Amino acid sequence: MNIAVCDDQLEELKAVESLLRMWQEQQHAAVRLHLFQNAGALLEAARKERFTLYLLDVMMPGTSGMAAAREIRTFDSAADIVFLTSSPGFAYESYGVQALEYLLKPITAKKLFPLLSRLYLREQKPQE
């Protein structure tokens, strides 16, 4: 799995990174993790490298996570997008970018691990 995480709050970014590393160790999963504190840097990287999963904060200064997701969909329709946010107010809008999940902060192992496991298993299945 090639995962991009974007959150303008460093503490939140590090907390999600810690959860992802914990899941990776528990599952012995092959994961490449990329962390971004703004959507501009994320989008620049996403145009150069394909990520299989985007974990995006919704409310960020400058380009929001929702706007970043719309931009990602212009060049990558296959990647999974999951929003990690403190605001339930954008859940409906997330359908417009075919978001897989909309998780409310604080993000916990109980919320994140089943999702990661499901995606990892799907990725490991041979394509028919």
Describe the residue ranges of each PLM region.
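CheY-like receiver
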Residues: 44, 51-126
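Short, surface-exposed amphipathic charged segments that create phosphate/polyanion-binding patches used
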Residues: 4, 48-50
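Two-component/phosphorelay signaling modules centered on CheY-like receiver
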Residues: 10-34
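Conserved sequence signature across two-component system core domains
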Residues: 6-7, 36, 54
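Switch/coupling loops of ABC transporter nucleotide-binding domains
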Residues: 1, 31, 79
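Helix N-cap/capping motif at the beta->alpha junctions
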Residues: 35-41, 65
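Acidic di-acidic motifs
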Residues: 7-9, 86
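Non-catalytic signal-transmission and effector/linker regions of two-component phosphorelay proteins
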Residues: 1-4, 14
